[in-house]
């Protein structure tokens, strides 16, 4: 390093000199060699001639303020003697540096800087750090301060600081800026490089960008894309310089030094040429320039001036390209210009010729410029090209190029004046020929367009599309609309040559013109409508104001009246305010025919526009609504009209386009049939029954009156029917109506029961002709025909109906019982009658709910017939009804005098319905009706009502399932006597099984249920009772044979099963098991347990379970009436115990459940649920549960079918020991497995339970199989009441003792339970809560 200058300590001048030098030094990289000292350190300058080194002495002459003052000490006097405290303050965060730094490379000797640094021991928190640049700076400042104590020293210091800052920023930003400029220029030289020239989005048509002189800039600076012709002005160097100067001057506060630097830089730039700056300015222009309208003189001058720089840049760029090995033709805008040049052959030969010349007179001048490897050639070519550019008419050139560019074309009318000219000139070379066979008028208009296009060649695009030209184009478009798309496309391609835009743009313009014309057509109608509205509005506004005034006056009067209660009054006002948002009358526009007609005319025209739209992005409705919102609605004062009202008022015009096919429920098909059937049967017995049907569903008294008036053949049957009907009508029926809980849509549970009864009657009529069924019809009140009927109808429509079969199978007094819900004859005792009425009512109500139509018109005789059939079926399938059947041997064998008899009759009725295809349909209809009542449940799906109404159809439906079940039925020859029995046996080996099956699949195999109906109805209790009916009412079974031929009954049980499935929640399955094997149950309270296990198998296995029961059923049937009778007594017990038994799954009721699930393949899911429920011992619980919680499915049992089976099991044992509990019998045989009748409720509890009645709720001790009380989801209270009632009814002496403590159980149900208790003394079912 050169000998550092020595600092004179004494004289100030040297210091200043040094200071100045130092300033320079600072500019230079630090050259001073700092010498760190552990003690106060000093950097001693190399001894200068006149310098006296301070020889390591800490104290130095104060004057020797060598710059080494510790950075901290910015004091004027150097604190050398005592090194300043840690230089930390001065230290900028640079890494700790022991003040020693490598000396920068030696430079012209400058004064040495002596630094005194105090090194302190580092601590955990801090350590000494030094920044060499800062130390130098600080030292220099201190030196200045020390040496110059005059006030001017501050100025010097400030100036130095400013200068340092300026230099710092220059170093930081200046260089990069220059580099950036260069890079940008290079990037912009070949804008298109690397892009796909075929991409229509890339606009390479404006190649002149690269050739725009650097001296030109846009008028206001900046970039413009597709904005039409650009205005250029000469870029002034001074402006640029001034701008840069300003930038540089802003940071520094001392302009002098800055100016010097800047001036030097400027000179440099100027020497190098303003190439960088100008190209840079050119670049902005290039990005957005579309056309040049600048002065030619300026262009020429600049071109000449910048030719060298441009050529050099091109050369450099070419080298870079070669290095990248990209030989693709440069996509420099120049090339597009060349291509566009050929376009204007006529417009400007100058352009056409100039461009090739511009490119160095070579065939493809652009390529040589960039591709040529010879730098000298490149340079000359570029220079020549630039010179030629000076002679170009850039306006024309750019216009021509913009014509060819897709972007400029899409730019549409904004732009390039000469575009049309060049386009028209260029295209003719490749003008596609017009398609052949064009209309003469169209060809003439196209010729007119050609001529007009030539006139506008020199005008440019904006002037091209004049009104006349638009008219020609529109005329052509209108004619083309009548031609095919191929011809249209050919014409458009031809026209493209004559218009300053491409084909796509032309098509868009033509469509727009067409739509505009359509819009013009709207003006007049709109104006007329506006005028009409303005004429009408004043009057309406006046009325509105009057109304507002009247309201405000009324309000004021009220406020005054309430003045004494100011607070209350104010509160009231506040309360009123929200509702008073209207603050007065609503602004409701009153339409008149004139305005409506005007609106319709307007909409018609608008629809015409819509149809003209080629691509209908909107639907007609949205299109019209948006039009009304934006165009029509504003014609009214604000707030007086809404687009939806306009749409509504004009619907007559646009309805064909905007009306969506309404989705209407098509449910009523079956329902009407049911009604017809009922009507047909009604003629036989038309009296209060019909009235009842018509009467509100919930009219409890109607059924009784109907029965009274309609009591016809089979007095006992009729009576029982009446009682049942009345009971069903009574609140009990409603209470039991599961509809109320589950089926929200169905509002009249009683009516549902009535409908079921009616359906049963219809079935009976179909089987036997009019009979007591009419009475049953009477009890069945017609439920509200609203949703229920529709649902029923839909369900019915789904089911195959076989009315003829129902009609064929004769049913005696039982039909009425069946309708009422009892298959057995009218109970001999008034008590029995009442019970029977209750049970039948329940059943009727349950079934009626779904089959509203069919039940109401059925004649009493038909009902009786249906009852007889079902009682027969019951007798054969389940002997639950035997006891009451015996009591009522012939006509009312199934209709139990007591609730037990009623249960038995219900079962019998159910059985009949299931057995007899007609009865089955009818009965299923009731069940379905019940289900439909609880439409929520799958049961409703079966649509009992349709079945009832169309007994024949129902029969068919049941037949189908029946046939399916018949195979099972075949296994049990006993059932063979009755077609339904075979079904039952298919469903279950024995009638009892059939009953269970019904419980499980009431709908699927109604015939099964028909003869097992009692068990089905009163799941396990009925099983117990079933044996009784098997003994006594088996004669009914004999009638059932006629039914048995009717597989439709079985099919009907399928329907029932479906319904049950629907109302899976219902524990109806519990009932099914009981009725399933009346004989078996009677014989075996315990053997019901075995059955129950069978039932316990899968619900699908119900058939197999029922198989044993079915076999028993044959025996029951064989035993005939006596069995039925005996079964009846146990039936009740079975009902009670079936709940528990079901849980055990021991009763034959299980088989019943099995048939239910099996029989109800349609409702297999529901049946399965029932089966599970039965398994859990939900038989009785099922019965109870519907009462307490119609919506709740049996918790214990997975499905109502299971419940039924469990009940059946319990019922089987009960049947053996107790009088039949037929409460659930027919009524319980709900088409829906979910709706499976409560095993204990029997006829009393309608099978129409939207939910499964958990048998678990009812805990009944069964004689054979201890009733397993499954935990019932239903309310415990209901369960208790039901169990108590069931137990009492099952017990022989407690006919009346069994009073349901809970309202959910209708009185008639309670009575039925009591009757069952009387008849059945062996009921040993302890009541179990859930």
From Swiss-Prot:
Which InterPro entries does its entry note? HRD, UBN_middle_dom
Compositionally biased, Pro residues: which spans? 81-96, 1030-1044
Q: Where is the composition biased (Basic and acidic residues)?
A: 16-31, 55-67, 560-570, 1321-1330
Q: Which UniProt keywords apply?
A: Acetylation, Isopeptide bond, Phosphoprotein, Ubl conjugation
Disulfide bond positions:
none
List cellular component terms (GO): nucleus
Residue location of crosslink Glycyl lysine isopeptide (Lys-Gly) (interchain with G-Cter in SUMO2): 258
Give the GO terms filed under biological process for this record.
chromatin organization
Q: Where Phosphoserine occurs, residue numbers?
A: 13, 236, 297, 402, 405, 408, 570, 1107
Q: Which residues carry this modification: N6-acetyllysine?
A: 1052, 1132
- Keyword hit for Acetylation: yes
| Matches recorded under Pfam families | HUN, UBN_AB
Any idea which residues bear Phosphothreonine here?
229, 238
Question: Would you identify the family this protein belongs to, as annotated?
Answer: Belongs to the ubinuclein family.
This protein is called Ubinuclein-2
Q: Which organism is it from?
A: Rattus norvegicus (Rat)
């Amino acid at each position: 390093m050169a000998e550092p200058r020595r600092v004179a300590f004494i004289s100030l001048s040297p210091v200043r000199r040094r200071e100045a030098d130092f300033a320079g030094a600072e500019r230079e990289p630090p050259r001073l060699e700092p010498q760190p000292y552990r003690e106060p350190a000093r950097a001693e300058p190399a001894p200068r001639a006149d310098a006296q080194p301070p020889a390591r002495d800490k104290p130095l002459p104060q004057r020797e303020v060598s710059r080494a003052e510790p950075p901290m000490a910015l004091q004027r006097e150097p604190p050398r003697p005592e090194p300043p405290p840690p230089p930390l303050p001065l230290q900028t965060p640079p890494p700790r540096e022991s003040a020693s730094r490598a000396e920068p490379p030696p430079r012209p000797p400058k004064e040495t800087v002596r630094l005194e640094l105090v090194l302190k021991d580092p601590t955990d928190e801090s350590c000494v750090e030094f920044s060499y640049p800062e130390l130098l700076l600080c030292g220099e400042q201190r030196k200045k301060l020390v040496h110059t104590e005059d006030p001017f020293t501050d100025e010097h210091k400030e100036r130095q600081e400013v200068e340092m800052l300026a230099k710092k920023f220059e170093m930081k930003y200046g260089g990069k800026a220059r580099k950036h400029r260069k890079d940008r220029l290079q990037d912009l030289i070949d804008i298109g490089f690397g892009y796909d020239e075929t991409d229509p989005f890339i606009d390479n048509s404006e190649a002149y960008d690269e050739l725009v002189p650097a001296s030109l800039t846009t008028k206001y600076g900046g970039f413009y894309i597709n904005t039409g012709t650009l205005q250029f002005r000469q870029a002034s160097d001074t402006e640029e310089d001034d701008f840069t100067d300003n930038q540089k001057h802003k940071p520094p506060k001392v302009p002098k030094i800055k100016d010097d630097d800047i001036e030097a830089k400027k000179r440099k730039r100027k020497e190098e040429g303003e190439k960088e700056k100008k190209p840079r300015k050119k670049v902005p222009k290039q990005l957005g320039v579309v056309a040049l309208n600048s002065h030619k003189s300026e262009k020429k001058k600049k071109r000449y001036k910048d030719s060298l720089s441009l050529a050099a840049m091109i050369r450099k760029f070419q080298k870079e390209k070669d290095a990248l090995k990209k030989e693709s033709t440069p996509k420099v805008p120049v090339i597009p210009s060349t291509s566009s040049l050929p376009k204007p052959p006529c417009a400007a030969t100058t352009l056409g010729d100039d461009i090739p010349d511009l490119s160095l007179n070579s065939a493809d001048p652009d390529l040589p410029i960039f591709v040529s490897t010879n730098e000298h050639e490149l340079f000359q070519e570029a220079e020549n090209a630039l010179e030629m550019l000076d002679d170009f008419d850039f306006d024309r050139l750019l216009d021509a190029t913009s014509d060819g560019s897709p972007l400029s074309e899409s730019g549409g009318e904004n732009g390039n004046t000469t575009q049309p000219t060049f386009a028209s000139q260029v295209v003719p070379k490749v003008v596609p020929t017009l398609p052949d066979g064009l209309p003469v008028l169209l060809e003439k208009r196209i010729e007119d367009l050609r001529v007009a296009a030539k006139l506008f060649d020199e005008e440019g695009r904006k002037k091209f599309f004049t009104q006349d030209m638009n008219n020609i184009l529109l005329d052509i478009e209108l004619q083309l609309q009548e031609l095919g798309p191929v011809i249209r496309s050919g014409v458009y391609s031809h026209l493209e040559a004559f218009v300053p835009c491409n084909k796509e743009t032309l098509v868009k313009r033509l469509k727009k013109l067409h739509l505009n014309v359509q819009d013009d057509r709207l003006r007049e109608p709109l104006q007329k409508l506006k005028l009409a509205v303005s004429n009408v509005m004043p009057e309406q506004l006046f009325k509105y104001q009057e109304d507002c005034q009247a309201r405000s006056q009324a309000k004021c009067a009220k406020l005054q009246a309430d003045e004494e209660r100011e607070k209350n009054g104010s509160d009231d006002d506040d309360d009123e305010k929200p509702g008073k948002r209207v603050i007065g009358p609503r602004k409701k526009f009153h339409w008149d025919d004139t305005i409506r007609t005007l609106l319709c005319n307007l909409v018609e025209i608008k629809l015409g526009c819509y149809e003209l739209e080629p691509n209908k992005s909107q639907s007609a409705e949205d299109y019209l609504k948006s039009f009304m919102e934006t165009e029509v609605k504003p014609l009214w004062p604000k707030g007086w009209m809404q687009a939806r009202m306009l749409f509504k008022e004009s619907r007559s015009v646009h309805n064909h386009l905007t009306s969506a096919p309404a989705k209407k429920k098509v449910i009523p098909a079956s329902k009407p049939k049911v009604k017809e059937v009922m009507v047909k049967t009604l003629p036989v017995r038309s009296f209060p029954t019909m009235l009842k049907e018509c009467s509100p569903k919930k009219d409890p008294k109607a059924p009784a009156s109907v029965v009274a008036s309609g009591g016809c053949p089979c007095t006992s049957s009729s009576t029982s029917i009446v009682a049942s009907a009345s009971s069903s009508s009574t609140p009990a029926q409603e209470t039991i109506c599961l509809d109320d809980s589950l089926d929200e849509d169905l509002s009249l549970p009683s009516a549902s029961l009535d409908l079921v009864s009616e359906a049963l009657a219809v079935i009976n009529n179909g089987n036997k002709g009019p009979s007591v069924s009419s009475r049953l019809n009477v009890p069945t009140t017609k439920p509200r025909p609203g949703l229920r009927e529709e649902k029923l109808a839909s369900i019915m429509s789904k089911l195959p109906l076989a009315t003829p079969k129902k009609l064929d199978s004769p049913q005696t007094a039982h039909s009425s019982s069946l309708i009422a819900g009892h298959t057995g004859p009218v109970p001999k005792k008034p008590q029995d009658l009442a019970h029977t009425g209750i049970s039948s009512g329940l059943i009727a109500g349950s079934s009626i709910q779904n089959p509203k139509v069919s039940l109401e018109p059925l004649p009493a005789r038909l009902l009786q017939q249906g009852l007889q059939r079902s009682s027969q079926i019951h007798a054969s399938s389940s002997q639950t009804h035997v006891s009451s059947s015996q009591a009522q041997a012939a006509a009312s064998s199934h209709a139990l005098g007591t609730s037990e008899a009623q249960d038995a009759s219900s079962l019998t009725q159910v059985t009949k319905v299931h057995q007899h295809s007609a009865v089955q349909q009818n009965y299923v209809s009731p069940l379905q009706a019940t289900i439909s009542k609880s439409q929520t449940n799958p049961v409703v799906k079966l649509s009992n009502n349709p079945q009832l109404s169309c007994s024949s159809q129902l029969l068919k439906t049941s037949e189908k399932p029946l046939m399916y079940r018949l195979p099972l039925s075949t296994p049990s020859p006993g059932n063979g006597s009755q077609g339904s029995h075979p079904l039952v046996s298919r469903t279950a080996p024995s009638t009892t099984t059939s009953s269970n099956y019904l419980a499980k699949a009431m709908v699927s195999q109604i015939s099964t249920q028909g003869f097992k109906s009692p068990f089905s109805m009163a799941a396990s209790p009925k099983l117990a009772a079933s044996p009784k009916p098997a003994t006594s009412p088996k004669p009914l079974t004999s009638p059932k044979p006629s039914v048995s031929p009717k597989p439709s009954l079985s099919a009907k049980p399928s329907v029932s099963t479906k319904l049950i499935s629907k109302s899976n929640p219902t524990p109806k399955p519990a009932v099914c098991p009981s009725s399933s094997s009346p004989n078996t149950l009677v014989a075996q309270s315990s053997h019901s347990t075995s059955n129950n296990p069978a039932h316990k198998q899968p619900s699908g296995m119900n058939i197999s379970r029922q198989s044993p029961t079915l076999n028993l059923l044959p025996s029951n049937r064989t035993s005939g009436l006596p069995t039925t009778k005996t079964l009846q007594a146990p039936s009740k017990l079975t009902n009670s115990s079936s709940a528990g038994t079901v849980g055990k799954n021991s009763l034959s009721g299980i088989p019943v459940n099995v048939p239910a699930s099996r029989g109800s393949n349609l409702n297999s899911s529901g049946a399965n649920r029932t089966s599970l429920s039965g398994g859990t011992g939900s038989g009785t619980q099922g019965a109870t549960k519907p009462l307490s919680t119609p919506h709740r499915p049996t918790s214990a049992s997975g499905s109502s079918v299971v419940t039924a089976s469990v009940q059946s099991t319990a019922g089987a044992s009960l049947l053996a020991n107790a009088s039949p509990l037929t409460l659930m019998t027919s009524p319980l045989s709900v088409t829906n497995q979910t709706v499976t009748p409560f095993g204990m409720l029997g006829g009393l509890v309608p099978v129409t339970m939207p939910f499964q009645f958990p048998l678990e709720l009812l805990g009944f001790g069964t004689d054979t199989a201890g009733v397993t009380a499954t935990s019932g989801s239903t309310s415990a209270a209901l369960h208790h009441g039901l169990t108590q009632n069931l137990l009492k009814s099952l017990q022989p002496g407690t006919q009346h003792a069994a009073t349901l403590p809970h309202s959910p159980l209708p009185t008639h149900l309670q009575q039925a339970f009591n009757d069952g208790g009387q008849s059945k003394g062996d009921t040993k079912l302890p009541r179990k809560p859930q």
